[in-house]
Each structure stands twice: as structure tokens, then as C-alpha cells.
Amino acid sequence: MTFVVKPQPPSKTTQSGQEAGAAALLWIRSMVEPLYDFRRPREVSTFLQAHPFLLPLLVEAHEKIAEYFEPSTKPILEVITDPESEDGRELFVLVPTHDTPEEALSRLERLDQEWWLDVLPQALGKMTIDVEYC
């Protein structure tokens, strides 16, 4: 029997700043990097370390995206400046697709209605899921 030990999500409330940063970095490297491609990896990692509450949500999002889009698709994480965001920066989860715009938007709409809108408050305005046409 093989046991796999998964790191616990980082918690700023129970750890010092340095411990929380190290825990977030471990979580990013072991749980998030294998699931996503990072555009400007340093910027994405820094953003995730500053917003560790997104890390478990990203793991769950990957599973849900695979249910609605091609399972072999590797979503992309990119930090984008959004003038409507409180600090102007937001993490975008971009789902690459070769679908027609109608089909891709239909899939995204189903993902939104059946999962994303229910968990959206957990993202605290720091994460958006969208499609990217290939």
C-alpha cells in the first residue's frame, strides 16, 4: 500500500508570515504547478503566495474544468491588471480551446452555473475563469 501525503493548504492565521510563505510555495510547487501552465511564472507564484486562499480553489477548479472541457487541456494561469479589481491585479484561469466560440461559451456558461458561481465568493474578487481560443 502506498500513502501519498498532500501538503495542507497554507493558513496565514496559524502560521508566521515566513511559515505561511513557505507553506504557500510548497503548495504551489506540489499541487498547482503540475495542473497549470504559468504565464510569467514568477509573477503568478508571487501573486499566489500573496493570496494563498486561492490555492485549494485552483486544485478544485482544475477538476471541474476537466469535466466541462477536454480533460487533457492544461489551463493557463496569468496575472492580469484589471482596473475594476481592488488592487488592480487578478488571476485569470484561461482554458485553451479549439471549440467554436458558441461551443466554448456554452461550456463556460455550464461551468459557471453548475459550480463557479457557487464558489466565487471564496475567490474574494482575485480570480476569474475564461476561455482562450487557440
Residue ranges and their predicted role:
Residues 1-35:
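Terminal low-complexity, intrinsically disordered regions
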Residues 1-5, 85-87, 102-134:
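Acidic, proline/glycine-rich low-complexity IDRs
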Residues 7-8, 45-74:
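Long, contiguous juxta-domain segments that are non-catalytic but functionally important
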Residues 24-56:
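N-terminal presequence-like segments and adjacent domain-start helices
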Residues 33, 67-91:
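Short edge beta-strands and adjacent turn/loop segments
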Residues 38-47, 83-99:
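Short glycine-rich, basic-tinged beta-strand/loop micro-motifs
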Residues 80, 96-100, 132-134:
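Short strand-loop junctions, especially beta-strand C-caps/beta-turns
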